[in-house]
UniProtKB/Swiss-Prot annotation:
A motif (DDXXD motif) lies at residues 531-535. Mg(2+) 2 binds at residue 531. Monoterpene synthase catalyzing the production of beta-phellandrene from neryl diphosphate. Also produces lower amounts of delta-2-carene, alpha-phellandrene and limonene. When incubated in vitro with geranyl diphosphate, catalyzes the formation of acyclic myrcene and ocimene as major products in addition to beta-phellandrene. Residues 1-36 form a transit peptide. This is Beta-phellandrene synthase (neryl-diphosphate-cyclizing), chloroplastic. It is found in: Plastid, Chloroplast. One of its GO terms (cellular component) is chloroplast. The gene is PHS1. It comes from Solanum lycopersicum.
Amino acid sequence: MIVGYRSTIITLSHPKLGNGKTISSNAIFQRSCRVRCSHSTTSSMNGFEDARDRIRESFGKLELSPSSYDTAWVAMVPSRHSLNEPCFPQCLDWIIENQREDGSWGLNPTHPLLLKDSLSSTLACLLALTKWRVGDEQIKRGLGFIETYGWAVDNKDQISPLGFEVIFSSMIKSAEKLDLNLPLNLHLVNLVKCKRDSTIKRNVEYMGEGVGELCDWKEMIKLHQRQNGSLFDSPATTAAALIYHQHDQKCYQYLNSIFQQHKNWVPTMYPTKVHSLLCLVDTLQNLGVHRHFKSEIKKALDEIYRLWQQKNEQIFSNVTHCAMAFRLLRMSYYDVSSDELAEFVDEEHFFATNGKYKSHVEILELHKASQLAIDHEKDDILDKINNWTRAFMEQKLLNNGFIDRMSKKEVELALRKFYTTSHLAENRRYIKSYEENNFKILKAAYRSPNINNKDLLAFSIHDFELCQAQHREELQQLKRWFEDYRLDQLGLAERYIHASYLFGVTVIPEPELSDARLMYAKYVMLLTIVDDHFESFASKDECFNIIELVERWDDYASVGYKSEKVKVFFSVFYKSIEELATIAEIKQGRSVKNHLINLWLELMKLMLMERVEWCSGKTIPSIEEYLYVTSITFCAKLIPLSTQYFLGIKISKDLLESDEICGLWNCSGRVMRILNDLQDSKREQKEVSINLVTLLMKSMSEEEAIMKIKEILEMNRRELLKMVLVQKKGSQLPQLCKDIFWRTSKWAHFTYSQTDGYRIAEEMKNHIDEVFYKPLNH
């Protein structure tokens, strides 16, 4: 039986394929389908190509937006020759030239939730101007902004920069020393100071500028200075080290190196190459347009992998970078060890060390990385990280600990586990939530122009719409095939057109593999018909008759038909397989028909054995026998192996019968079968059907059986992911051929991730609508 194919039926109306048709809901898309096809206007396609070229160029323009906050701190560094002169006067010029109309400084354009960021940046700029006695008019306007918006200092609805209470309170003290009278409510000032006192007891080296003279800067530099001369890659903290401890050549060299790239301002983090590359690759994948930039992404990840192998501090001194690099590299088939994440296994140790104030972003990225365990023993580090990060984020959600909606949404998605989500639906949601003015926040808010821009947004929208057009065209082709072969006379309703094509897009999203996708959908429908006949529609003698007809394929006429039902069935089945075998022969340059037929024959014989031997109670299979047989009858072997011939890759029969392929279909089949058994165990126990739960309950309790089955499931899921991601020495199997098996299991995980049938039906109805029909601007 096809995994989850008929467990829930939903109604979906569409003029293209008939109104009020019902379709099977249990299916999942593994990742996005993107297509380039002819467009109505040349100018539109030219714009599409131009945008793609500009996005490609962005791989070489890896920078962040200017940080008023950090630039102000650098501006406050005194000259090495005179304490009465600025070391970097160009920063003062930038501050004077970049005050906003309302008198503030900060991210431009700003955001309604960034008032604390604007207050922090504005106060830092006022300190710099006051210290060097310049910009009287700018100071006056800046104080006006603080007077108007000072109420936001303690507002819980505003997004706080990292260490805001510590740093802002410290800057208030600095203003007092400079005789800069701040128009702030005294009660608010005292509140901030109280929060500073409680926060400063923690490990706050990253916000050292907020500790000021109380910090042991000599010890700080000794412990935390990086090879590039910075403290935490933070221009502000490094500048503070020179303000309070003026004797470090490497700190000066670091700040000077920034001005080799930026004339008179600094970003909130530098260097930015690793950060920008990781975020750009991740964003392209989330938008579902990464296939357009394969060579650029490969080059970027090769560079990240080189730095990973060198244990470069740009990766390993930053929790977010380390976790993102591990995730992106492992999922892109690079050999990376989870040992590099060992220092994050303990929650208490994590929050007490590393010198840097922790944000939910770091914990979110650690959690994403922790889901990529592929070995029970070697990846126990990931299991430990997964346990505490999951508990931490669940508690945050429970306490409503996220101010902005996007952060909360990201966490909710991450907690669903990446292998139980639909990437195609997530691509759409990511595009809809994508904003060219999106920002992130450290000690100051910042943007990445090469990651958030109108080109990438327009490109992603256009690409998604082209993909939808191809989906609709292929659905029409499938409908014509359904009608030409009169599948309805075999009991297959037209509603299965959507459902079967959904499976095809799930497993084969690549737009150029249309033949493979349509073949997959046709196989799903044929398999449904076969399953119906061998399960209940046909008698035992009719099933034997069908098997004999398939065995004597080229001489089937000499066999004869037991009934008209068998004749109608075999006529449709024969024509369908002959058609698909012809296409496969053209693609492979040789006949593969016998192999395709033998795969069907094996499936049918085992289906009949289940019915005659197992369901009748004549034979009770062992656990291993049960898993082996049901993996095959669950289509884990037939469809993925047959699909290989349609992928545009020449592949030998020997390779398809290799131990590697056997391991892949066996693991994916076990995953699908176990997921099904866990969900259907209650129903099948009442029906006295054989499943893994009932087999294990002969020697243990139901609770123990379910626990044991979940262990087997997790072991096989990890083993499958390992076989797909880890490059086996001497393997001749193309990567795409292996990916098919993981995508199939991912679809099963999504199908069985919900136990509420109504919820599945509603979610899948929306899923089909959004993927195939609904415009992005809907």
